Amino acid sequence: MAGKVLGRSRYVCYNGSGDNGGDDINDDEDDKVSSCGVRTEPKLTTATLTEDVRDGAGDSESSSSGVSSRPTLANPVGPSYSSFQVDSFKLMELLGPEKVDPNDVKLIRDKLFGYSTFWVTKEEPFGDFGEGILFLGNLRGKRETVFEKLQRQLAEVVGNKYNLFMVEEPNSDGPDPRGGPRVSFGMLRKEVSEPGPTTLWQYVIALLLFLLTIGSSVELGIASQLNRLPPEVVKYFTDPNAVEPPDMQLFYPFVESALPLAYGVLGIQIFHEVGHFLAAIPRQVKLSIPFLIPNITLGTFGAITQFKSILPDRKAQVDISLAGPLAGGTLSFAMFFTGLLLSSNPDAAGDLVPVPSMLFQGSLLLGLISRSVLGYATMHAATVAVHPLVIAGWCGLTTTAFNMLPVGCLDGGRAVQGAFGKNALVGFGLTTYALLGLGVLGGPLSLPWGLYVLICQRTPEKPCLNDVTEVGTWRKALLGSAILFVILTLLPVWDELAEELGMGLITTF
């Protein structure tokens, strides 16, 4: 029968005994044709698969001794594997992002760069898949002035096809003689480097998450008002002999009393997102629709808001990232402090709800503020009666602190990346993961929050167009103050301090 030789285009004709018509195979046998009408080839079996197959030429080297004396290959299918590997690379290249046109690279190098701007000495791949070009060389002027000039000339030379990035030179030997880090210029196609628009299914998901967040916020309000359940309702759910369901009219006042807390939690988060958008508009940065994350303990874990355009510089990244937590945190603290004042007002006694005093041990900062306002007598008890605004503000401040953790693309991670660079974010991120894993920050919420970040928010932001220029001292100082607020808010009160301050009833065995 005829069989196809691996890696070859010719066919072999075998007889029934497995012979090839002779013991010796000569080089001229490659040109002979057997009686079955196809070219004869040396016999290949499992034991004697030793022919050195050569890709393309079609001719094999043979010795005068026999098939069994031929040199043995370590991998007889090597050429086929190499061909498959090359085809795989070609397929990945076709399916991958579109690369920069080599003709445009030559044109840009000749027209843009030179003695007065940036003297190019080397070119390297740029981007996640090497789809762009990175120009390395020597800067010939002030980096901001040169970058602005290159951006303007790029649009004049090739139109609106590419985005130009100014980044720190990778593996640089030292700083720039003019001061600061050495810079390079990367170029990517706009359709590759710019985020895509928000799709219809993303709007649907955002709507579903918003409805779920409303539900979790209402659930939080209901949980805070359980002591106000009508006796008939409590009896129905606790007495096994009660078979008659209570009148639904009894639930309406109970649910209405739970709504203010839900409104407060949702209002804080909406205020947070408005802060992001108000900071993004003057900087011409587009943001996606917020994807709210429901949580039954805090009402919400915040929201995922994506950048839908490339950030112009690191200052814009810091400003937009801090604007949301600053807005939401300010409103949260106003609610929290106002609620504490109302909690100590006898006229508001009818609106107060009891909460476990252990709650105030969950945050060092908020616990100390509560202790200073409410006093020893109120705090040194199993439960503390507080106004619902205290709970709303507490939840809002805790959510704000979690979102300001310096990791991934959280607000805190974006701000740290913009203020101190991507390398600093790696160090901050590892430290944050360690503290969350050990339960040092966040208490019982550290595990679910850490999983949420790992699944949804672990990836840092992509570079800004100008990813080199520093953000200034006051922005770094503001960010440092925000991180200090995060630590003090998420750090719990240790038992010795709580007992000394009279925060709750500490029981030791």
Task: Indicate where each model-derived feature is located.
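Hydrophobic transmembrane alpha-helices and their immediate loop junctions
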Residues: 1-509
